[in-house]
Design a protein with these regions (language model features):
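Non-catalytic, topology-defining segments of multipass membrane proteins
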Residues: 1-60, 93-197
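Post-HEXXH active-site segment of zinc metalloproteases
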Residues: 79-95, 125-126
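Acidic (Asp/Glu-rich) catalytic motifs at the cytosolic membrane interface
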Residues: 65-82, 103-118, 202
Length: 202
């Protein structure tokens, strides 16, 4: 996407009345935080019962609702005060098995550096469908590595919390060998490889 295309894009959408990121009351923010939980419970239940198609469908919805909630938390839009938005990101990191602190860092840079080489998150938006799929496993690793490198001590400290929560989730799954937890770890790792497709490209 060249400079001309970026300018055209911004001009074309400058007058659009976007309906996302509407300011929320605290009660609405709490409800928003609850949206992924029924899908988490359903995916674990179906995995425990070995009904894999339904488990996969519930996991798909879990990841999509978690991505939506993550976006609201990144922009501080849930109506909470203090550090609450950050703790939402930490909780989602434990559930989604990635660092949402890193995602937040890259997403805010995406808004600032749209369409430039600094826009790592937006790079997938300039690829073909097959390129995005091929890039999938590398995309979250690149997002995390760059955030760790550029983010400074505060971002690295918050990323360390996220990654410790990831390790805890994986550790519990391996120690208990609970089928639904092992399934969750596997399906979330696959979902992380598809974030470039669902969160950026589509």
């Amino acid at each position: 996407m060249g400079t001309q295309s970026i300018a055209t894009y911004r001009r074309r959408f400058a007058g659009v009345m976007w309906r996302d990121l509407q300011p929320m009351r605290v009660r609405e923010g709490v409800v928003e935080c609850l949206h992924p939980l029924p899908w988490l419970a359903a995916s674990w239940a179906f995995a425990a019962w070995q009904i894999w198609p339904l488990a996969a469908g519930a996991s798909f919805m879990l990841f999509l609702t978690a991505l939506r909630l993550n976006h609201e938390a990144i922009h501080g839009n849930l109506g909470f005060r203090g550090k609450a938005h950050r703790w939402v990101l930490h909780g989602l990191s434990a559930m989604m098995l990635g660092s949402n602190t890193a995602v937040a860092f890259q997403h805010l840079r995406h808004h600032r550096y749209l369409g430039t080489p600094e826009d790592i998150e937006g790079a997938c938006g300039r690829m073909t469908f097959w390129q995005v799929l091929r890039e999938g496993p590398r995309f979250p690793l690149q997002m995390h590595a760059d955030a760790w490198h550029r983010g400074g001590p505060v971002v690295r400290r918050r990323m360390a919390i996220d990654l410790a929560l990831n390790a805890l989730m994986v550790g519990v799954a391996l120690l208990t060998m609970a089928p639904f937890l092992l399934y969750h770890v596997g399906v979330m790792l696959i979902a992380q490889c598809l974030t470039g497709l669902f969160a950026v490209w589509i």
